[in-house]
Amino acid sequence: MKQMRELFPLLRQWGIVGVKSGFVQYASHRWATWLHDMVRLAAENHLLMNIHDEYRPSGFSRTYPNLLTQEGICGNEEFPDATHNVTLPFTRMINGAADYTICYFDKRLKTTHAHQLAASLVFYSPLQTIFWYDKPSFYHVEPEMEWFEN
């Protein structure tokens, strides 16, 4: 935490508005507490937070609204099928925003483009993105991209 106490004010000086933590073993009490301390410190420094990996949302973002979203979901980086995805709004999403990792054009997907387009709307996250493993250059000719832009 000592490094973050020095780093977070520096990030603000540089104009950075948020950080994404990742690859922390959140399952233990020790690391969950460490992560919550990080969110508090980010709030003190007016930084937004996005938690990566298997963190389980517990309502902490109600106290610290700078915690905009957290993964804690089997998103497209795991290439789930449509059956998995249609259960998420009724299971994982009841615990708050989810950083799902939409992979709109990835050829390994087991769903359609229409499914991905709908998922980006149904799966709530203030930091929604549409190209995780994709390249932005793939998107310039697709008419539905106007919907994402607006």
For the regions a protein language model found, what residue spans apply to each?
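Charge-patterned, long linear interaction tracts outside catalytic cores
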Residues: Y100-Y139
